Amino acid sequence: MSKSSTPTSARDSSTPLLVGACIAWGVATLLFFLLFTAPGEDGAQPDWFLTGINLLEIGAFFFAALLCFRNWRSSQIVSGRNVWFWIGLGLLFYAMGTVLFFIWGTVWGLDPAVSLGDFFYIFSYIFLAAGMFKAVLPRRLNLELPQWMMVVGIGLGGVLLAIFVNIAAAEAIAVPLGQVPAMHHLAQAPPDVAPAPALEAAPAEAPALEVEEEASSAPPLILQIDGMLEPLVDAVGLLYLIGDIVLLVIAGTLLVAFWGGRYSQSWKLIAIAAFCLYIADMFFAYAINTDTYVEGSLWEVFWTFSAIFFGLGAVVEHAVSVNSRRSPRRRRG
């Protein structure tokens, strides 16, 4: 028996444990969303629920980043160590962005148009795209026409879906706005009632002032930074859209380039992770554009699923790479 059999068997035994941990994390997240959701009368979720889903998402991205950095430190990874360094860095930045959004929204009660967390998200898209592109680049793609058409179709589908989300959001906003004049006239129909709302309007402003005071519990420096970043809201939204489409195109290319072969399974999982991220971002974009976003919606589970699939892809890639490098020496005595 070779002296290397002990560490090799340890690696083999860690693979099912890590795969099981990733799957269990995803199942636990889905069950938490389904079983413990408790929206109030206004549709908002309680703070303990928001804390729970944020911790599950942050933990999933940190865990997936560690698995990617594990591949980066291994000299046996077939797809290249730098590939997993950039993917791991992207996942780490995404986790840090979620931490900042949790602090801004749940701890400080802020809801700025642009915050520091947005920039961590944008950099995470850049790093993820760089890592996935490095995985495709060395393969010298010799795709046939149907395969290229599939990649182009995925890209066009992503662009059209993003356009549809924006158009649907604009129409959803236009419908209630069109109804406002009719409701306004109905309210003014009885002339005797007109002075009454005016008298009651003064005390109604008091709760609004209280809400503003409660929302300003963040440090003054943070409020100043949010005010400075607010003019960048359109540019940040455009960067998010470009990042989603680029990741979607690269994910489609990964599916085509790694469709068959021994090392295809890990990259199929990475592509699924990118698709999950895109799905969640499209739901988020629609909710933000229609001003109907409520943190803790069920579709947010796709963000955690994205981290889970990135982690699964890293585990499978490590297992396949280690087994392929040691297979010629397996029977050495």
Q: At which residue positions do the language-model features occur?
A:
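Polytopic alpha-helical membrane-helix bundles and their juxtamembrane interface segments
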Residues: 2-333
